Amino acid sequence: MGFFEKLKSGLKNTKDALASKITGVINSFTKIDEDFFEELEETLILSDIGAVTSANICEALRKEVKATGTTDPAEVKGLLKKIIAEILRGDNELYLDTKPTVILVIGVNGAGKTTTIGKLAYNLKSSGKKVVVAAADTFRAAAIEQLQVWTDRAGVDIIKHSEGSDPAAVVFDAIKAGMARDADVIICDTAGRLHNKKNLMDELKKIARIVNNNAPDSRVETLLVLDATTGQNAVNQARLFKETADITGIVLTKLDGTAKGGIIIPIKEELGIPVKLVGVGEKIDDLQPFIPQDYVEALFE
């Protein structure tokens, strides 16, 4: 199954919850008036798009309708697709243009951080990259063992210390090992704690310092892993993490198990952070680059 087919199948619940409701609104009106926009905005809000983004989409739609002279509600779907694709367009590429590139993976426990690292390591190795993984989430019981299982499956090296060790020390060793082994990419797991923001911030700053001091020429990608099934809560998490880290991209997991896949839209619209990768299944090769146009086509097809 190609990725577009996987995406389409993964977005089925979201399509049923969001796109079909939008179609329902469109089909129930014979003209585009204020009632139409109100109904559409309410539908978007109820589909986890959030009040701010829903209002912005409807405002953009009003302008498009006026500019194009559209009077038939049936033509609105095409305009909506264009508006949503425009919102999602951004720097969706994962940059691996330095050797090594360092990827810091952050996110709360349970969002799918460890799984994402395993799948990303597998993807990169499959494309010919040499990968080293740093098990720097040293606080959560079993995090290191879990990551070991995934790196074994992906066939990549792991650098680990004992549970409770200093995460920055693990990252330091991983950078040194990565350079010695001529690695293309070093992926660093981090502790998934948000309840103590100061600790998290201090820890991420310390890790960033280690990276900057020991791999000064490396590009650093900081990826925030969010669970699509949590809906608006994912936007709130992203907002909090944005205050503590310089996030370069989002990885949205569990897109296949939720009707809340529309959450991608407010994350980009309200926070300005591009989605770079999406998880659409449980298999090791089910983490794929996010292509906005494919997402919109799969949603509204």
What is each of the regions a protein language model found here?
Residues A191-R193:
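Short glycine-rich anion-binding loops that position phosphate/pyrophosphate groups of nucleotides
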Residues Q146, P167-R181, H195-E301:
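Conserved catalytic-core segment of NTP-binding enzymes
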Residues M1-V25:
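Charged, compositionally biased N-terminal leader segments and the immediate start
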Residues A17-A136, A143-G164, A169-C188:
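Primarily NTPase-proximal linker/entry elements flanking Walker-type ATP/GTP-binding cores
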Residues A136-F139, E163, T229, L255:
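Structured loop/turn residues at secondary-structure junctions
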